[in-house]
């Protein structure tokens, strides 16, 4: 369905939220953002994004889904580390890509702490300015990498994976491992970020519904 895909996304035109400005009991309604069957639209019109203190989440069909985007930040103290289930599935995905002949490295970029993201973002701002940096880098507290559920795939050449056939493989097969390609071409307005063929987000069983 489009429900979680839209909930996970962020509109670049809105100002980022702050954890201080939202109470721990606040719930926000997110309207359905994509088309589907009438029955789907009737049952999936809205999702409640709930402040859990250090992060925001939405209840999916199967499990709680941590939400991290330009609307919903995480506390600087939120430090879950790399999710072991997500990592295990990522390694399976990488192995499958390698077996299919893609030059994918065993190395990847996974969990990043608030402090690490602060350094990265500031480096990008110093290099390109804040407006440009905001197109391709999350501000500290707003990066999916801080959830421990996001991973950037790297090729054997050391570069992020952008090759067209590899990107298509991910679109076709990532959901088999519980992942979605988060930042798609043509969805920059919705996500607030440039397309990233290499960036995967683990959502478990929800992935196949999102990809459908």
Task: Name the predicted role of every residue range.
Residues 1-9:
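Sec-dependent bacterial lipoprotein signal peptides
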